[in-house]
Curated annotation (Swiss-Prot):
<protein>
    <recommendedName>
        <fullName>Small ribosomal subunit protein bS16</fullName>
    </recommendedName>
</protein>
<dbReference type="GO" id="GO:0005737">
    <property type="term" value="C:cytoplasm"/>
</dbReference>
<keyword id="KW-0687">Ribonucleoprotein</keyword>
<dbReference type="GO" id="GO:0003735">
    <property type="term" value="F:structural constituent of ribosome"/>
</dbReference>
<dbReference type="InterPro" id="IPR020592">
    <property type="entry name" value="Ribosomal_bS16_CS"/>
</dbReference>
<comment type="similarity">
    <text>Belongs to the bacterial ribosomal protein bS16 family.</text>
</comment>
<dbReference type="InterPro" id="IPR023803">
    <property type="entry name" value="Ribosomal_bS16_dom_sf"/>
</dbReference>
<dbReference type="Pfam" id="PF00886">
    <property type="entry name" value="Ribosomal_S16"/>
</dbReference>
<dbReference type="GO" id="GO:0006412">
    <property type="term" value="P:translation"/>
</dbReference>
<dbReference type="InterPro" id="IPR000307">
    <property type="entry name" value="Ribosomal_bS16"/>
</dbReference>
<keyword id="KW-0689">Ribosomal protein</keyword>
<dbReference type="GO" id="GO:0015935">
    <property type="term" value="C:small ribosomal subunit"/>
</dbReference>
């Protein structure tokens, strides 16, 4: 089972709100997911990002692949840097 960390769209028309979820890559965008690890609100100024860092690092360590947008969010939060350092054993 290929697992991805991606955004699940919530909110009303023209006002997107996203949940950062871990899901099987074959399930639909807004379909079944394994675990919710955060939220992303692009409408707020500045955009609000809340991510459970421990859960994100756990799933990245287990081989989950983040989508491009989630990778950018993780990089801005410093999660990708921590993941790469832990992979190198530092």
């Amino acid at each position: 089972m290929a697992v991805k960390i991606r955004l699940k769209r919530m909110g009303a028309k023209k006002t997107p709100f996203y949940r950062v979820v871990v899901a099987d890559s074959r399930s639909p965008r807004d379909g079944r997911f394994i675990e919710e690890i955060g939220t992303y609100n692009p409408v707020a100024q500045p955009a609000e990002v809340k991510i459970d860092e421990e859960a994100a690092l756990k799933w990245l360590g287990n081989g989950a692949k983040p989508s491009d947008t989630v990778r950018n969010l993780f990089s801005n939060q410093g999660i990708m840097e921590k993941f790469h350092l832990s992979k190198q054993g530092k």
